[in-house]
Amino acid sequence: MKLNNASLPDVSIAKPSYDRSEIGVGIVHFGVGGFHRAHQAMYLDRLLSEGKAKEWGICGVGVLPGDRKMATVMDDQDGLYTLILMNPDGSRDARVIGSIVDYKFAPDDPEAVVELIAAPTTRIVELTITEGGYVTDDAGPDSVFGLVTTALARRKERGLPSPTIVSCDNIEGNGDVARKAFTSFAERSQPELVEWMTANTRFPNSMVDRITPVTTPDVIENLSADYGIDDEWPVAAEPFTAWVLDDDFSDGRPPYEDVGVLLVDDVTPYELMKLRLLNAGHQALCYFAYLAGYRLVADAAGDPLFAKFLLEYMDTEATPTLRPVPGIDLPKFKQTAIDRFANPSVRDTIVRLCFGSSDRIPQWLVPVIKENLRSGEPVRLSAATVASWARYAEGVDEQGEPIDVQDNLADSLVPLAKSQLDNPTAFVENTALFGDLAQQPRFVEAYLWALDSLHRDGARATLEALMNADDR
């Protein structure tokens, strides 16, 4: 049964109980992928199911060539898709999500996107454009920044309030990063708009959390076999979800607090906790795991040695850099994170975690290292993680098989990593990624030890040595 509005009454799993034709667009979301559909769109679907937020429906927008597939699927399925929660015991909870009521592929009609954002009914613009998506140097008028800035100028001319711009990407101070990016773009393209944006446009910081693997063919096949639903692009995710938002909006917001979103005055403590424990923990795991032969995150996290390494990193190096987090049991959060990684039903891949490392390590791990160098706290496990990335980036595993290093900077990183066989600090001398870490003796000593051990003894033996050492 093809999933769309016509077939929705016949769907046997949980589905929208609300009339989607009555839902107005109040949120424009750039970057509709698996995570947005498992997270922000899911929260809004919950509100709609409670008879709330009918003016806050989502219109997704794609700006990249690769977004055309999503545009086609959204059109074919009237914006409907299935969210499947993968429980650790092997059971699954499936629901059709209906909160995305429209989708526009910007390259086909950029003017329509601009007018949508400029419409008085649009009050929030959301972003999931990845950690590397906030560089505006080469951004043009048809980019996210160009489209939104043009729309803001029209709202200014029409005397309309500014929409709130909400970044939902895993970046420390994501709202601040978004503000800087949009302001920088406006200064070059429409300088007369900057003062109005500064006075009127809000960019709340946010913390988002849900492990959402890439949708694989077996997810699609199982959905059809188990429930009779033909969904071209369902989403599978873990049961855990969290969203913490600065309560700072320009023109209203949905009552997110009614469906479990935490609205706070300062999201920073929650954000640092998540990025430095969970996200950086993913990076601490993934390169060692790949080199040791693991290909699924759950298998690696279920290995007692790897779990011990993760908890040790969290306890001794990440935690000292955190601020007090109101209402959070930190030891429980850390153990829950490892348990989430080890969920065998969430078939998240090591390769996904390794993807785009040049955007991730500088955002999530390098700040931990720098803070601990300043404060005198340990850095050996963080330095070993950087060394494991450098070893992975050489492009050959421990069996001599090629590694497909998927990174925007792969063309420069792979040769740099290979050159460390002659110049051991070559990789970390990249100041754009690591700042001055190559000039920090305590970091360099720990890094060189780990890199030498990885080359000489391999990933598993290196972890064993790290876990058996009192200090290094």
PLM regions: where:
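Substrate/ligand-engaging "lid" and interaction regions
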Residues: 1-472
